[in-house]
């Protein structure tokens, strides 16, 4: 071995790392911090509208916007066999996760003259399974949050991880609370009876939810927390759709309708947007232009024809095992994309429109995948199910192997060991990391690209699904949201071929360095990174990055989101005027 094969580095014990001076942080905050409560200007059982005039264009708004509302609804059905009440909230029944937004077909937000729209119900249950689950669960004091881990709620009723469970199901870590532990203001009509009795139960509850709509933030990103300014008018419209995901229960045949006797038929009460306003200190000088990271999540749906057979339980006398029902390969439609997304999310589920309160947020397990992208065919054909799970975790999924694979082992006292179906696969792939790209392309590249894929799935559940399933693709397209003097614009697909090639000669960051510096949440994974230091500076968040121009014209700093990353080199010609 030659000494040129390695270099020597001195590593000093922390105890011995003494110094004759320390750095002392001088914390600079806002001159005024004003929590603002904004009432809806119009409200019905089909839509809610807000129109908010900001104090001034110089006022900084927190991008963590909360909606607070009372929900009034009625659950009707007949008491099930072996039950004495229609609903046993905290055991077999509970609210769904983020119940208000689960009602929204679309959320439309207009900032100044620019409008962004998201198909909320179509994408939110998938997006919840990405990023840090612990940070998502921090909202469980203001809204039920827990996501489903079981395919069917009946399997979860006696389990400690029952998503519909009560406070008694909370273990030593109180951060993880089941949805049945959330306080319901009023339950009326859930009187005792016998099996077959018809009941209508009126429920009233107040929730406070973070809006899951970019450029707003809803997790706790470490690199993407800056506010935005340059706003004159903020308008939001919530279009209300079906109630089939509002309430969840293992009791079959329930119907859920908006409004109840306590609200005179109205579904919403005291509906407000909670926004935090910040007034800068007189010494804070910032550009008129403000740039923040942005992402959009368009979805592409392919309806599936045919019957997906049920799984079969095999009893060998000592244990029960599941044999999955098999289904022929499912082919997606050929999808035209005008940019290369950061990530793609693929799943197969019962059609959202066909789901009922008895259906968990579950997806058929994916065992094989084949991708055709940009004239390259047969990508990932040899990947095993375990490979696909590891790729999903690397792309930000918080699913466990037991959840992704669709089956887990359970032991109940005095019963044989048995296998039960779990919530199934949300497959996530990062472009350029898991799906190969040519040297002139990267996530965010503009162009015309064709994507087509096929999946093989299994069904471990005891239910066959006939002509009521769908294959869903969600693409994560990132870019920037630019505000200046009362106007705003969104930009995605901001990289040209020359931008990608010129970046090849720049000093590089390792992926692990980026994750360490900017965090690991879904909103930290946007390509418009904020908070990265100049390569080789040895500082994180220092200098200009996150400093005097934090959240300003350079989106967090000279390198991060500014002149280099997202600007003149990596932002392309049409972005240069906005980021320099």
Annotate the PLM regions.
Residues 1-542, 574-579:
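Short, low-complexity Pro/Thr/Gly
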Residues 540-570:
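Long, intrinsically disordered low-complexity tandem-repeat segments
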């Amino acid at each position: 071995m030659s000494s040129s094969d390695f270099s020597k580095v001195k590593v000093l014990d922390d105890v011995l790392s003494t110094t004759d001076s320390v750095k002392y942080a001088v914390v600079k905050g806002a001159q005024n911090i004003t929590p603002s409560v904004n009432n809806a200007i119009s409200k019905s059982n089909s839509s809610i509208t807000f129109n908010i005039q900001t104090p001034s264009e110089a006022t900084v708004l927190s991008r963590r916007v909360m909606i607070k509302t009372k929900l009034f609804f009625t659950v009707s059905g007949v008491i099930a066999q072996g039950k004495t009440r229609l609903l046993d909230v905290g055991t077999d029944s509970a609210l769904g996760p983020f119940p208000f937004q689960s009602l929204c077909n679309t959320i439309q937000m207009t900032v100044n003259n620019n409008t962004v729209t998201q198909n909320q119900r179509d994408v939110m249950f998938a997006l919840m399974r990405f990023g840090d689950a612990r940070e998502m669960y921090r909202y469980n004091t203001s809204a039920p949050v827990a996501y489903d881990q079981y395919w069917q709620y009946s399997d979860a009723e006696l389990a400690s991880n029952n998503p519909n469970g009560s406070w008694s199901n909370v273990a030593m870590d109180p951060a993880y609370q089941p949805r049945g532990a959330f306080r319901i203001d009023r339950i009326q009509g859930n009187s005792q009876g016998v099996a077959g009795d018809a009941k209508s139960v009126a429920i009233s509850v107040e929730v406070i939810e973070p809006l899951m709509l970019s450029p707003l933030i809803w997790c706790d990103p470490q690199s993407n927390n800056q506010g935005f300014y340059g706003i004159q008018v903020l308008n939001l419209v919530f279009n209300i759709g079906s109630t089939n995901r509002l309430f969840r229960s293992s009791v079959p045949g329930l119907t859920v309708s908006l409004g109840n006797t306590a609200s005179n038929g109205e579904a919403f009460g005291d509906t407000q947007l909670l926004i935090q306003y910040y007034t800068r200190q007189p010494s804070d000088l910032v550009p008129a232009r403000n740039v923040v990271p942005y992402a959009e999540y368009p979805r592409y749906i392919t309806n599936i024809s045919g019957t997906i057979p049920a799984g079969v339980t095999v009893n060998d006398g000592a244990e029960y095992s599941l044999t999955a029902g098999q289904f022929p390969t499912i082919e997606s439609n050929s999808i035209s994309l005008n940019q290369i997304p950061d990530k793609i999310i693929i799943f197969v589920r019962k059609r959202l429109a066909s789901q009922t309160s008895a259906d968990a947020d579950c997806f058929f397990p994916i065992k094989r995948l084949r991708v055709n992208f940009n004239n390259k065919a047969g990508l990932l054909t040899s990947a095993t199910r375990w490979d696909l799970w590891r790729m999903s975790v690397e792309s930000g999924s918080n699913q466990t192997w037991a959840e992704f694979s669709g089956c887990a082992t359970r032991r109940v006292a005095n019963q044989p060991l048995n296998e039960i179906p779990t919530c199934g696969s949300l497959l996530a792939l990062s472009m350029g990391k898991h799906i190969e790209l040519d040297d002139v392309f990267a996530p965010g590249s503009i162009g015309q690209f064709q994507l087509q894929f096929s999946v093989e799935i299994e069904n471990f559940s005891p239910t066959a699904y006939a002509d009521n399933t769908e294959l869903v693709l969600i693409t994560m397209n990132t870019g920037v949201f630019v505000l200046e003097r009362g106007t705003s614009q969104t930009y995605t697909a901001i990289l040209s071929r020359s931008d990608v090639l010129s970046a090849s000669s720049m000093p590089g960051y390792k992926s692990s360095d980026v994750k360490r510096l900017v965090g690991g949440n879904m909103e930290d994974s946007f390509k418009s990174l904020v908070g990265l230091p100049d390569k080789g500076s040895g500082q994180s968040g220092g200098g200009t990055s996150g400093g005097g121009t934090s959240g300003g014209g350079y989106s967090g700093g000279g390198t991060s989101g500014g002149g280099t990353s997202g600007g003149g080199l990596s932002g392309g010609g049409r972005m240069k005027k906005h980021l320099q």
